[in-house]
Amino acid sequence: MGLGPRSAHKARRQFSGAGRRGRAARGSGRPPPGRDGYPRLPAAARAEQAPEALPHLSPEALGYFRRALSALKVAPDAAEERELMARNILKEVEAQALALATNRTGSEMLQELLGFSPLKPLCRVWAALRPNLRFVACHRCGVHVLQSALLQLPRLLRRPAEAEEEEEEEEEGGPSQTLEELVLGLAAEVCDDFLFFCGDTHGSFVVRTLLQVLGGTLLESERGKPRGSQSSETQRTSARECKPTDFEVPKTFLNRLQDLSACFLKDIAVFITDKISSFCLQVALQVLHQKLPQHCAHLCDAVIDYLSSRNSSADGSPLLLFLRDQTSSRLLEQVLLVLEAERLQRLYKDHFQGQLCSLAEHPIANFPLQRLLDAITSPELLSLVFEELSPALEMVLAQGHPGVVVALVEACRRVGTHQAQVLQLLFEAFHCAEPPSRQAACVPLFAALLAYEVYYELMEEEGAVPAEHQVEMATARALREVTVLGSLLLQHLLYFSNPGLVLRSLSALTGPQLLTLAQSPAGSHVFDAILSSPSVTHKQRRRVLKTLKGQYVALACSRHGSRVLDAIWSGAALGARKEIAAELGEKNQELIQDPFGHHVARNVALTTFLKRREAWEQQQSTVAKRRRALSSILED
């Protein structure tokens, strides 16, 4: 989608493919071996890393482990019995660990088995793989087994020391190394040949998981990646919203993490320019930012210093060239997100200032610019960026980069400044600033990311006085498709200190239009902001939500609408709950038969409402009292 200036070129008023990142135009981005000075093992040396004869996994053995895993999954919930089964199965695994790990089906089963494994059996399997560690780490199936083993650490490190001692006493001939020693041994081997592991397509996954485990933090952006056999739907994650899961690790892990951090500094050029290796550095920055911020700052300085020392571009800082590069720009995005506020402001003044508009219009560089906006926390820096970028908002939208505008609006929300100015600029960009009556249409325009003339299919000559907003025309038209970025834009605006104009536009929507918004996968989240924003008063919230009266059954029978109705119900007073229940009760049978509606009926206690009204009211009053008591406790 896009918006354009008021001109004959109306195509520019509509964004085209706005949220996708255009980074696949020039191949993989990874230089061919031998041309970049990147160390590669000779073919003979690589052959030496593999076992002389790769062990074969017989169909009988594969069938046995498949049946054993199925039995383990349906085993009784009793921890001791399930653990005993896992021990017995994994004891059989030890002798065929390499064969299982390097077989596609066997690898998938071994990954699941490790999820059930107690501490010592996992150490035994790991020890069985260790003589061929490099081969397994760089094998397309074996790599996922190593990742799965590493990802068991948060679970296994929580076990009390007494349990470990009991295991050592019970198991004869236990592994010679503890789990901590095995992890440190893997880290030492990776450290000895760091460039090789980081540059290998499969080995880099092990490095990235190892960095997280050593730091005691699992990144959400990486948790969907280990299992190569999973569907693409399962693997999709949001890199922008990276919420780490922390767990306690031994001090030796952090010491080894520092060693790996130093390895990046030795060959910083490779990790900036090589696509596969760059992923490892990006993960390292996130982990170090959480656990060792000083080392993170050193790495950031090394990246910026290296890029700043390259040949200058024609239009200013040499860093600008790398902001437009597929590989290095992704690394710079991560650098921007972890930089300290003072360093971020210095980076802006040294490299970004005066270039924001050209970066915003570039198909690649607009993404690092979005991360810069995401990282801003000081009013001073936001003022500098806002002053430079705000005049170009409409042109940026016309280029199909609404993410930049959404990031700027989010920065205004977060910092708490320039909110009125950015809203006025949005009105102008979407051609609903003048006449003022058009402002009532801002919500449909923002949601669809369409200019006023495009949304309402008007033919206006260039230079003509904009027509007044026609309420009849607006109410008769169905709401257009809600975009993800349009929904985010509305959510940020509703969290502004004064969201009155946006709420007025929401109140102008008809019941069917508001229903369409609630039933939309993206639009339903706008209601989350309406219900939770501290800037929206109870009166304003009620004015918007009362329009949904008569639409409750349709909401309840919708995947996303039912979620919205549940949220409305949770915050509704007793009187509003009676109205909702009465309307739903008229279609009780329809709700019970609907896959989403029957959950709503149960949440509302609709059967009790229809048959025992007094008991229902007493139950709802009790729930309301508990909610008020909990709210007062939380406020205190």
Curated annotation (Swiss-Prot):
Tell me which domain of life the UniProt entry assigns to the organism this sequence originates from.
Eukaryota
What's one GO MF term for it?
RNA binding
Compositionally biased tracts (Polar residues): 228-237
In this UniProt entry, the residues modified to Phosphoserine are S7
Disordered as annotated region, ranges: 1-41, 222-242
Which Pfam families has this protein been placed in? Answer: PUF_NOP9
Keyword RNA-binding among UniProt keywords: yes
Pumilio repeat start-end pairs: 92-123, 189-223, 313-348, 351-386, 509-544, 547-581
Q: Where is the composition biased (Low complexity)?
A: 25-41
Q: Which UniProt keywords apply?
A: Phosphoprotein, Repeat, RNA-binding
- What family is reported? Belongs to the NOP9 family.
Q: What protein am I looking at?
A: Nucleolar protein 9
Q: Which organism is it from?
A: Mus musculus
Q: Gene that codes for this? A: Nop9
